Amino acid sequence: RRQRQMCIRDSNVAAKEYFASQISKNPKGKRINDYILNRGISAEVIKEFEIGFAPEGWTNLFDYFTNSNKKEFINDEVGLFKKSEKNKVYDGFRNRIIFPIKSKKGHVIGFGGRVIDEEMPKYLNSPENEVFKKGKELYGLHEVLKNNRSLKKVIVVEGYTDVLSLFSKNIKYAVATLGIATSKNHLEKLFSHVDEVIFCFDGDEAGMKAAESAMKICLPIIRDGKSLKFLFLPNNEDPSSLLEKEGKEEFEKRIESSRVLSDYLFELVLNKYDDSIENKAAASKEFMSLISSMPGSNYKNILIQEFSKKVDIKLEEEVKVISKRKQIKVSEEKEFDYELDK
């Protein structure tokens, strides 16, 4: 297994070097470099993140490995190549800007590719293998840790270019998920390094849904001393466009004024209901359902107290009832296990 993992990593390093060389060698690669620079991403950041280019054509990387005595890297496990119906091998990444994805320690474990023409899917990631699991990795985390000796917070943005734009403006604490929703693994990894995680979303309906999903995933692992915040951008804006319009200082003000979890949670629930007794009861039920996944903590107790004030209902008794139900359930499960053992 160790040998397979080393082969995958070595293959990725060789591919990364090839893709990086095409930015300067390939005529279209030079145009791609200009395209990236025009989006406000600095040459220094392009170099630090080792951005590359996969040229047009079906076998550029395949031919490079073949002609460079690197045939051992042409295998199914790595995920750099695909096979046609006629069993012919061709490049998986073609005519795309290439973003090497690195582990926390800096090993290249996969790639993200952004299409230039809109005929193909916009983003393409390496398939998962022994060293690359999308639900566990975060783009930019290696660079964030490398650039910050005393890291206090991390902002999670939506895409690779958002991370690069923020780094280019010296906001070097940005990461992105790999084209998937935030997972429990992502959050646990971030909270192992920082006490404050800020999610940055578009202000549209999709962004609101993504924020709610992230919150629900976070609730079971939030604990005293850890903070979750939400930053919603104006419609039709992303970090790159806002940085261009407002500059670093104003964007960091937005980060500082992000909504804390308690405010976001209360607003999410209460905005669905009016002030009638029936709806206050319904809001309380939804709120208790949401926080039921949270571990016991001072923070959870304070959330309950503050929400109780907002709906003018004492929820402490409800908490005791829920807690008692859980104890009974655990007790019954233990009794059932005992009966099975007999």
Please annotate each region the language model reported.
Residues G40-I51, N69-E77, K83-K86, K310-V321:
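Short, surface-exposed acidic
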Residues Q3-I8:
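Short, small-residue-biased leader/transition segments that mark boundaries at the very start
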Residues S103-K104, L145-K153, S183-V197, G203-K342:
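A charged alpha-helical hairpin associated with nucleic-acid processing machineries
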